[in-house]
Amino acid sequence: NAMGHAVRSNYLYAGVADVYAETGEEQLMKNLTSIWSDIVNRKMYVTGACGALYDGTSPDGTFYEPDSIQKVHQSYGRPYQLPNSTAHNETCANIGNMLFNWRMLEITGDAKYAEIVETALYNSVLSGISLDGLKYFYTNPLRISADLPYTLRWPKVRTEYISCFCCPPNTLRTVCQAQNYAYTLADKAVYCNLYGSNTLQTELEGLGKIALAQHTDYPWEGSVRLVVESLPRASRKTAFSIYFRMPEWCDKATLTVNGQAVAGNWKRNEYAHVNRIWKEGDIVEWVMDMPVRLLEAHPLAEEIRNQVVVKRGPIVYCLESMDIDGGKRIDDVQIPTNIKFTPRKMQIAGSDVMVLEGIASLNEAESWEGMLYREVNPTQKPVHIRLIPYYAWGNRGKSEMTVWMPVKR
């Protein structure tokens, strides 16, 4: 199981994956697979973040063995222990999650690992740096409330200098190296793991140098256009494959070469591919449906039970209090299961983002001052809300924020 300091743990798992790649020791892979399953299925946030606890104890369960219990710090918690306001989720731990999954992808070629790389990169890694690149988060909580009656260990506003200054350079390094995660190569094959406008110049063993150009507005749109720009003379008689990852969030995709449809029964977390003798100027179009989805959590995740998160493509969305009409509180907003969101481009801090606008329900209640419980207020009214990408929160001044919102069924 995944346990202990989340940054050190994730870097350790990445290192063990490197050892397995060199030695092929099967017990290492067995352990890594078990740890990965524990993280992804029981301990990872929807943003790809890791390390729920700032301080805690381990092991922590129903048994009582005081001599075996130790204090843990900035660590993984119990299975399904995923608090929002107190979530630690150090940026370095989220980067470590990327590094671990990247190595598992290189070893196995399984698209499910690329899915985690993308989820963490677009959400809990990019959230660690402001849109202007000048301010940082050490921790990445999923909720900010103005009413907490206690002080959190780390400030929940972006700052230019962090006393524990590991996350800022680590984030910048990761962003600068993101191109290295876009493609992987195999025998006469190119795998597209991450999508974004770019040019790939590489060499395929037994074939020679090739150049591919990718054109797309991803992650805002699901259409990817790949152009074969240059090929070696030897390739005129040799076929090779181009693979496109079908993400977990995509139910339907189409693949065409020079306008001709390519048949295939592709599934989530798999690769679609075309194998052929290519020509310079060939155009491949890979179009993924990108619906707005409402996600719910496992019922054992008590802090987020009966709540939903909004996701479109790889982007997790959040609600800031400034984006609720009438200046209402995030606590009062509920998301109907039949809500219709409209994607719209806007700028935040000079950066283009895709926001989602829709009509939610508002349960406008009186102040909770001096109360812990009270009778349910059944009165609700519609309210216009705007959701922004989670990575972009905290760039417009201080506000409340939440990723998970109560669901109205």
Show where each model-derived region lies:
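Well-ordered alpha-helical scaffold segments within catalytic/enzyme domains
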Residues: 11-26, 81-85, 96-109, 227-232
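Carbohydrate-binding/catalytic loop surfaces
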Residues: 1-11, 49-89, 133-162
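Long, well-ordered core segments of solenoidal/helical folds
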Residues: 1, 31-48, 119-130
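C-terminal beta-rich recognition modules with glycine/proline-rich loops and embedded aromatic residues
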Residues: 32, 115-123, 128-230, 235, ...
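Active-site lining segments of carbohydrate-active enzymes
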Residues: 1-27, 31-42
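Carbohydrate-binding surfaces of carbohydrate-active enzymes
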Residues: 105-114, 247, 274
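Beta-strand-rich binding/interaction modules
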Residues: 237-258
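A surface-exposed beta-strand-loop module
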Residues: 254-283, 292-298
